[in-house]
Amino acid sequence: YERTVREEFQRLKDSSCVCIFLNSVTGINELVNSLHLEGESRIFCSEEGVGKLKDAGFTNAVSSIDYPLAKYNFFTSRFYSAVDIELNVKPDILILTNLNNAVYTTVDPYTEAIQIQGRFRRMFEDKQTFNSLTHITNTCDLGALSREELDKQIDEYKITYQSLIERHNKTTNSARKTSLKQQLKQICEDYLLDERLNIDYFGIDNKYNEERVKSYYQSGEKLYAAYEATKFFRVNYEER
């Protein structure tokens, strides 16, 4: 992974503008330092991330888009959607996923990858909005559950939940209510319940999506197939 990333930055050394999407402030900071990009880069991330970077000695980090951009511009996930990036030059886009350091750097080809390229709306003379889009990732078994496995898991949780919540609602003893609440929180996964201990259907939908995306990163072939299945990208797949 690290060697491939270095090779890609070398390939893009003559690009006027490179926009790198990596959902890890720590990963971005390590990359900037290892490639000696401090004087040519800007980082766009959360306020908390800006604070961490300043503590680490990197001052060119902000929490909202402002211009001009640098040669190398790093964005965390809050900039994957909703924010337009306006440029006078056609950028090269680089998406990075490093599962060895942060599982949350995965990118969903069906949503986030499409949203990322959609941040660049200016169409140039060749009818394109960017020069290239490259996604570099390592792969591993993240223990993704199939939809059928997750169905069964959630069904079992719901049976347990229903039993406990009925006992909770029937009892008038405050100590019993407290005990049953604690049992609910211990037995059920976080995504299953909202703050009021009701079934969180939005959380359940997110869990299905999370497991779906994790399954793509079991191999390069599976991720390639997912990109192809979107019918949005013309994909060239290379394994190194």
Spans of features found by a protein language model:
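Conserved strand-helix element at the start of the C-terminal RecA-like helicase core
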Residues: E2-H36
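Conserved SF2 helicase motif VI
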Residues: N100-T129
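Conserved helicase motor
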Residues: N23-T26, R42-N60, T76-R78
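A conserved SF2-helicase RecA2
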Residues: D126, L133-T134, T139-H168
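Flexible, charged surface loops at secondary-structure boundaries
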Residues: E8-S16, H36-L37, A61-A70, I85-V89
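SF2 helicase motor core recognition
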Residues: I28, I65, K71-I93, Q115-D126
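The feature captures the C-terminal accessory region of ATP-dependent helicases
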Residues: I154-R240
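Short loop/turn segments at strand-loop or loop-helix junctions that form parts
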Residues: L22-V25, F44-E48, I93-N100, I136-C140
